[in-house]
Design a protein with these regions (language model features):
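A general structural signal for alpha-helical elements within enzymatic catalytic domains
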Residues: 151, 167, 356, 505, ...
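Short secondary-structure junctions
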Residues: 18, 594-597, 752-767, 811-816
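Accessory, non-ATPase domains that flank or precede helicase/AAA+ motor cores in DNA-metabolism machines
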Residues: 1-446, 458-474, 788, 795-828
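Extracytoplasmic/periplasmic
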Residues: 739-754
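Active-site phosphate-binding and catalytic loops of NTP-dependent enzymes
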Residues: 99-108, 185-189, 303, 515, ...
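Inter-lobe coupling/hinge segments of SF2-like helicase ATPases
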Residues: 278-288, 292-293, 299, 305-732, ...
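A carboxyl-terminal module marker
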Residues: 754-755, 763-783, 805, 819-827
């Protein structure tokens, strides 16, 4: 937003500010930047008593200068705004909603390629010779060490080099003294993680006829130059790479022509593409009656002048994606953009191919596994209006579409839509805010909607649309529960029941494919000494180590610690046995049973390189690999017509977790994975192996009876006062000293009493639980305790919690502690 008058001051959100001191800081705008500076740009500014350089985001500009001395903006980092006015409003809203700083919220919206790294360096001041600095540092060994390093390094060194000086723990105080004494100067450079990609382009500088006349006499002596000129006469301009390829000329020839003035060379921005170029655009398929009814109702909402929200509840394979495609087509016809989010990166390639087939180059992809350069370029394509359909995971909700008409959350119940990084946002809440800003439609899609979403539809907060049958009248798979207790009594102690083994062999005989689901990676859950019962545990975390047969090591899945598997127990010299099966062990068992059959494994250990999930799924599809084994990556969104059997190896795994959402998560996961079978013309079967075959949740999942499950779960939540009836705020404090963490938790708990006690009566009265240890007390040498607040999520409680968080961060007794607040955490 350009001002009529030149800007004199700017309100800036700072990267260096913690939540406790986060507010807009006022800085003077230097004359050199007065015409360039725009809200949404980033700057370098001095901050604090030591005037340390900090990145900042310009929030607003003013042409008035308040009284008092102001610090001045140092460097402009961006040639154009990285956030729009909507983005700035969103960052301010996220600060209030998710207890983060404005700058952290802004950074969350940007691709990492746009992030800056500040490099601080120091140099010997001009005019300071060796004799001078040796004399002035004679009484300070630390200062003498630093000056000696700078001298040996040619007069300049960065902060990391200075910190590496032996026995010099914290050099900052000494550096400030040297700077104050005029012996050194400080410089800060801001370097971006990735730059814009360009390539040299050649264009004629004269009329084609004139160029050919100039080069004609040299056709024999300089044939390559003549060919290049001839090609440019036809094309007008071309990349240097293309000119060299089609004419056989070298870059030296092209530079020579540029020197002669025949052509000019300039750099043109090009995009690193995250996807292959598309062929012909495929027309949309015809919707069946129930899809058409849902589509028409949703289209009416999308064309409303006010923001709308809807839930599309459809059984697995009912064709929700086709409804999405038709709605996106209508949004594009209206000149508006659309965002489609999926919970797993593994789901992106298959969905992307569908969208590319229908919308071609209008599609952009945004997720964290893209190479930094590709992700940055895709973001630019969206920002510049070259792509209007964005497909991606959670972070795609921030795609800078200028006119956003539709946001779709597919599999909206998934916990991966909630961030566990520095800003603890939920993509659904951000999507609501953005749809409100753009007056667009938020569409939540699922075969097993979150209890909160289904309740919102039931109470009129969302519009509800249903798809009760599979597309093309395909039947839902037939599901059977296999009792593993009976298997054990019959002498079968393997990971596969007799029933599942029989069905697998039947599929192999028919040439049909099978998916096996086991939500535990590694070989075995733990190693156990058969004599003394010793279990190797992680020295940094309060968890046992998981055995990985691929490298023969015991590994911690929380901090990354690993150790070789001991040959014997270090306590009693007994032998280790392995308890609990993981995907590696199941793969070994399957390969022993069927040595001539390929078993493909898909988990966090096999999905390591960029796009490795795409490669695996493409091989499974094209090569017709008989068995795909994996963790929850294989449970959702995969659509392979030749998959007719799904086996759930351990249906109880998530059912008894220490989490009020355990039943919901188990039901959803089982329903989703079972739904991978029978999506083509052949009927599907599914087998759920369990130790508790009478469990209601497992039986409802086997029947895919979501409505009965929802009714019971809703009543349980009402009685226990869990979401959607009350909200949860979870305050987690972690640190290296357990007593310090407990003390901080106790202070936070007491700080809530003045607000809680007058309000705690009645069905919606607030309640505080804790302090209590987290389910895993210690992770990476940091103890974790929690305080849980049950109440309505309104401005009053958010303001009180923000005040408590500021006080806790400013309490010197809490030095070294991390204090986080999660709103309605998905992990309970």
């Amino acid at each position: 937003m350009r001002m009529d008058k030149l800007a004199k001051t700017a309100k800036v959100a700072l990267a260096a500010a913690t939540f406790a001191i986060d507010r807009p800081y006022t800085y003077r705008v230097p004359d050199a930047l007065a015409e360039k500076l725009v809200p949404g740009m980033r700057v370098l500014v001095p901050f604090g008593a030591g005037n340390r350089p900090s990145e900042g985001l310009v929030l607003s500009l003013a042409d008035e200068v308040p009284e008092g001395r102001l610090k001045e903006i140092g460097t402009l980092l961006d040639p154009r705004p990285v956030l729009t006015q909507e983005g700035i409003r969103l960052a301010l809203w996220m600060r209030e909603r998710f207890f983060c700083t404005v700058y952290a919220a802004a950074l969350t919206m940007l691709p990492t390629g746009l992030w800056y790294v500040l490099r601080e360096s120091y140099a010997i001041a001009p005019g300071v010779d060796r004799e001078t600095w040796e004399e002035k540092t004679a009484r300070s060994p630390k200062a003498k060490q630093i000056m000696g390093l700078l001298y040996a390094a040619g007069g300049q060194a960065d902060l990391d080099q200075i910190k590496a000086i032996p026995d010099l723990k914290d050099p900052r105080a000494t550096l400030r003294e040297l700077e104050k004494a005029g012996l050194i100067t400080r410089q800060t450079q801001a370097k971006r993680k990735v730059g814009d990609k360009t390539e040299p382009i050649a264009r004629l500088t004269m009329d084609p006829a004139e160029a050919m006349a100039l080069l004609a006499p040299k056709q024999k002596t300089s044939p390559m130059g003549y060919r290049v000129t001839e090609l440019l006469c036809r094309l007008g301009s071309a990349s240097v790479k293309e000119l060299c390829y089609f004419t056989g000329a070298s870059r030296t020839t092209i530079k020579s022509l540029a020197k002669k003035g025949v052509l000019a060379l300039e750099e043109k921005e090009v995009f690193r593409r995250a996807m292959p170029e598309t062929g012909e655009i495929t027309p949309l398929s015809t919707l069946n009656n129930q899809q058409q009814a849902a589509y028409q109702g949703l289209l009416d909402l999308m064309e409303e002048p006010a923001p709308q929200a809807a839930l599309l509840y459809g059984v697995t394979g009912s064709g929700k994606t086709q409804v999405y495609l038709h709605l996106i087509q209508k949004a594009l016809e209206a000149g508006r953009g659309a965002i489609v989010m999926v919970p797993e990166i593994a789901l992106t390639p298959s969905l992307l191919q569908i969208f590319l087939a229908h919308f071609g180059r209008q599609v952009a992809i945004l997720h964290s596994c893209l190479p930094t350069g590709e992700r940055y370029d895709e973001w630019k394509r969206v920002r510049d209006g070259r792509a209007k359909v964005v497909v991606g995971t959670r972070s795609a909700v921030f795609a800078p579409l200028p006119d956003l008409g539709l946001i779709i959350l597919d599999e909206e119940q998934e916990s991966s839509y909630q961030s566990e990084s520095m800003v603890r946002y939920h993509a659904r809440e951000v999507a609501k805010f953005r749809c409100k800003q753009h007056k667009g439609l938020l569409l939540l899609g699922s075969a097993t909607p979150a209890v909160e979403s289904r309740y919102a539809a039931e109470t009129g907060q969302y519009h509800l649309f249903t798809l009760q049958q599979r597309y093309n009248a395909h039947q839902l798979p037939k599901v059977v529960l296999a009792d593993m207790k009976q298997e054990l009594r019959a002498g079968n102690n393997s990971g596969l029941s007799e029933l599942l083994r029989t069905e697998l062999e039947e599929n192999l005989r028919r040439g049909e494919q099978s998916i096996l689901f086991l939500n535990r990676r590694g070989n075995s859950r733990m190693a156990l000494c058969s004599q003394c019962g010793e279990v190797p545990t992680c020295p940094r975390c309060s968890v046992h180590l998981t055995y990985h047969s691929a490298n023969g090591r015991l590994m911690c899945h929380y901090c990354g610690y690993s150790m070789p598997l001991p040959e014997v127990c270090p306590h009693c010299a007994g032998r280790f046995q392995f308890v609990g099966m993981g995907t590696q062990k199941l793969q070994e068992e399957l390969q022993a049973l069927y040595p001539d059959v390929e078993v493909m494994r898909m988990d966090a250990d096999t999905i390591t390189a960029t796009r490795s999930h795409e490669v695996l799924l493409d091989r499974f599809r094209r090569k017709k690999v008989p068995i795909l084994l994996g963790t929850q990556m294989v449970a959702k969104g995969l659509d392979f017509p030749n998959v007719t059997l799904v086996g759930v190896v351990d249906g109880d795994l998530s059912l008894y977790a220490d989490n009020y959402r355990a039943a919901e998560r188990t039901f959803s996961l089982l329903t989703q994975v079972v739904g991978r079978a029978g999506r083509g013309d052949k009927p599907g079967r599914a087998i759920i192996q369990t130790w508790t075959p009478d469990n209601d949740i497992l039986n409802l999942a086997a029947r895919q009876d979501y409505d009965t499950f929802y009714t019971g779960e809703r009543e349980m939540r009402r009685l226990l006062r869990f979401p959607p009836f009350l909200n949860l705020f979870r305050i987690t404090i972690s640190g290296p000293e357990e007593t310090q963490v407990l003390r901080a938790c106790a202070v936070v708990r007491r700080s809530l009493d003045p607000w809680i006690k007058p309000r705690q009566h009645g069905p919606e009265g607030p309640e505080v639980l804790g302090p209590a240890p987290a389910p895993i007390l210690k992770i990476n040498n940091r103890y974790r305790y929690r305080v849980l607040v049950k109440c309505r999520n309104d401005k009053e409680i958010r303001a009180i919690l923000a005040q408590i968080l500021r006080a806790a961060q400013q309490d010197r007794a809490n030095k070294g502690l991390s204090i986080l607040i999660d709103v309605d955490p998905m992990d309970g």
